[in-house]
Amino acid sequence: MSNLTLSQFLQQEKGNLTPELAQVIDTIAATCKTIDQALQKGALAGILGSAGNENVQGETQKKLDVISNDYLIDALKVHPHVGGLASEELDDFTPAQENGEYLVLFDPLDGSSNIDINMCVGTIFSILPAKNAVTQAQDFMQAGTQQVAAGYVLYGPSTMMALTVGNGVAFFTLDPETQTFLLTTENVQVSADTQEFAINASNQRHWEQPVKQYIEELLAGKTSVREKDFNMRWVACMVGDVHRILCRGGIFLYPYDLKDPKKAGRLRLMYEANPMSMLIEQAGGASTTGRVRILEIEPTELHQRVPVIIGSKNEVERVTSYH
């Protein structure tokens, strides 16, 4: 069986997918191949470890955070159909081309704390329509429902892309010989029920009561009202956890906690929560803060953080009902 290339797949898609949008997605995919090659060199190229500074989030940047960010900025800021860029790693947005039809937001290397131990990392991206001929910061303040495409590239045992353009979710696998993304799964679906959950349990003492109650029920398994056992998984890379959910169901929680009351959550709305929520919802799952649907949040700042509860629909709805 011959697999469609990513470019061929994009040519066949309908709906929101214009030829211009297809070109932007192709450029993101090509840049992620370059990131993949840098990751594979690792210690051989002297690019592991800290870059010696912090990003706007107050997180210590890894060398590959900076390298991946630079690759994406350099490739997209000259793209004729990109009006502006926003990165988790940079304080402000980056202007691109006048009259560019799209805005691209990204987390260049999600889970970068995994780099030095050779575990999975990924690139997350979100594409919004541009609002003006010359992009302004306010143009990025669009709810997730306005996304025209979203996806991620997972750098794991094989390199894979998950993509939605508003018409379901598809998986592509990078052929290492031809360096081509090939379609390997169409119409990805998240099961409504699950017996797997992902959460950083070390924060339990900081959680709100609804989340504590929910997790206590899961841990009690058959002896609780749930009457079945659950397994816990935690990759420390949202791309890895969401990919597992898209493949076999599950629920991922990074809930609101009281560790730092100034932060409503830990994950970034524009670079992580929105694109992952679009993917999960397009695959039949659900996504919420525990109180509101993530895709309906009207952002007020570029680096806004939100709680995230995402995955199999029946479990997400159960957590929401506890709030």
Swiss-Prot record:
Signal peptide: none annotated. One of its GO terms (cellular component) is cytosol. Its EC number is 3.1.3.11. InterPro entries: FBPase_C_dom, FBPase_class-1, FBPase_N, FBPtase. Mg(2+) 2 binds at residues 107, 110, 272. The keyword RNA-binding does not apply. One of its GO terms (molecular function) is fructose 1,6-bisphosphate 1-phosphatase activity. It is an enzyme of class 3 (hydrolase). It catalyses: beta-D-fructose 1,6-bisphosphate + H2O = beta-D-fructose 6-phosphate + phosphate. Belongs to the FBPase class 1 family. This is Fructose-1,6-bisphosphatase class 1. The lineage of its organism: Bacteria, Pseudomonadati, Pseudomonadota, Gammaproteobacteria, Moraxellales. The gene is fbp.
